[in-house]
Amino acid sequence: TPNVMYVNAFISSLKSGNAKTRVSVSNSQYVENLVFGIQPAIYFNSGTVKTYGDIPIKLFTDIASLNGISSANLLKDDIEIIVIKIKSSTDLYSKIDLLKFSEFNKLKYIYILSNVSTTEQNIANMFLNYNQQYSIFYKIENAE
């Protein structure tokens, strides 16, 4: 089962790290910018692909679109973070198979953005074929 953290706690854990080295501080700033900053990105929803920027490093999608991700014509080589939107409470019962992301060579982070209240454990239970190369974190916004 993956270790799922609230996004701010995840970034804080990077900042505190084992020691406050320049590497851990700059890494936490990089991740913070990756999560909250505007980056070249791909939006993949309902089979439609929209790419913004030359070398996208961020992919936005939703639970319903995940099944089509492997066959979609996406620029996968430089994606470092995938933002998955949870729109309804029924989405929380969906499974996210991390094997679908195996073609994303630089992928390190999976960010769950939920419109419904949920827990770290509920999000962790959504994942299949967990691989420790991915850090998984979440945020709840505009919860019903």
Task: Identify the role of each PLM range.
Residues 1-2, 34-37, 70-75, 110, ...:
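A broad, low-amplitude sensor of folded, mature protein cores
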Residues 10-96:
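Surface-exposed acidic loop/strand-edge motifs in secreted or periplasmic proteins
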Residues 9, 33, 125-129:
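Charged/polar, solvent-exposed surface patches and flexible loops
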Residues 1-12:
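Bacterial Sec-dependent N-terminal signal peptides
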Residues 80-144:
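Extracytoplasmic electrostatic interaction patches
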